[in-house]
């Protein structure tokens, strides 16, 4: 599933090619993804200029004057700018043809993504309104995490993955951030000190920024005719490293199930 760094890189990859471009035609080849594609989408978008592209959590927002297309990539979705005349593939469900002849193309083999339209503030849309802050300062920091974790017995890893607390911290990045902060994933969130929270908030931001920086090396792929694999080459310290030696102390990395998700940690370094 594309996580926040992949979505941010998608934004950076397509924005230079679509910003300021007018949509001249819309072709929807599927009536429904995770939710139905609005039947009026073509009418709403055709003739409008994409003024800017934004990201909120894992949603991409195509701002078009007084309306916005809201896009979520789901589990397997990608957005690419296809050359003029490039034929669609089997899983290419939506095309926005631009005034330079190229096409902003949404591909989604498993059809768990979504494309919606709103004529009001997209941040007030029910899908976005209850989301927590982005996982970076100034809104997400140690003080914020400390205040939101008080009197909570939930495991800190589960708190990090709660989009109402903070957005964009998927399983990979939660595991890696907790390792960097030396905090056990099962530890009760309410037991963290202010110093713990400050360290963890910094680790979350650092892990995600590192992944985004890796993604910046793939920006050329967003105008390729072939769809790349889409996931960045990361070198995780704990994620997926069951039994391998900890990079700090050499202890074998342990794996448990937490909240129905695989969780990895160092039994010695993380307390």
Curated annotation (Swiss-Prot):
Spell out the catalytic residues. 2 (schiff-base intermediate with dna), 3 (proton donor), 58 (proton donor), 261 (proton donor)
Give the co-factor note.
Binds 1 zinc ion per subunit.
- Cite the residue ranges of zinc fingers (FPG-type): 237-271
Mention one GO molecular function.
DNA-(apurinic or apyrimidinic site) endonuclease activity
Set out the biological process GO terms recorded for this chain's protein.
Answer: base-excision repair
Q: Which cofactor does it need?
A: Zn(2+)
Q: What does the record give as EC number?
A: 3.2.2.23, 4.2.99.18
Instruction: Give a Pfam family name.
Output: H2TH
Q: What's its catalytic activity?
A: Hydrolysis of DNA containing ring-opened 7-methylguanine residues, releasing 2,6-diamino-4-hydroxy-5-(N-methyl)formamidopyrimidine; 2'-deoxyribonucleotide-(2'-deoxyribose 5'-phosphate)-2'-deoxyribonucleotide-DNA = a 3'-end 2'-deoxyribonucleotide-(2,3-dehydro-2,3-deoxyribose 5'-phosphate)-DNA + a 5'-end 5'-phospho-2'-deoxyribonucleoside-DNA + H(+)
Q: What residue range is the signal peptide?
A: none
> Which residues does the record give as DNA binding sites?
110, 152
Q: Cite the entry's keywords alphabetically.
A: DNA damage, DNA repair, DNA-binding, Glycosidase, Hydrolase, Lyase, Metal-binding, Multifunctional enzyme, Zinc, Zinc-finger
The record's annotation in Gene3D superfamilies points to: 1.10.8.50, MutM-like, N-terminal
- Give the source's domain of life in one word: Bacteria
Q: Which InterPro entries match?
A: DNA_glyclase/AP_lyase_DNA-bd, DNA_glyclase_Znf_dom_DNA_BS, Formamido-pyr_DNA_Glyclase, FPG_cat, MutM-like_N-ter, Ribosomal_uS13-like_H2TH, Znf_DNA_glyclase/AP_lyase, Znf_FPG/IleRS
The entry describes its oligomerization and partners as: Monomer.
What family does this belong to? Belongs to the FPG family.
Main function: Involved in base excision repair of DNA damaged by oxidation or by mutagenic agents. Acts as a DNA glycosylase that recognizes and removes damaged bases. Has a preference for oxidized purines, such as 7,8-dihydro-8-oxoguanine (8-oxoG). Has AP (apurinic/apyrimidinic) lyase activity and introduces nicks in the DNA strand. Cleaves the DNA backbone by beta-delta elimination to generate a single-strand break at the site of the removed base with both 3'- and 5'-phosphates.
- Protein name as it appears in the record: Formamidopyrimidine-DNA glycosylase
The source organism is: Geobacter sulfurreducens (strain ATCC 51573 / DSM 12127 / PCA)
Gene encoding this polypeptide? mutM
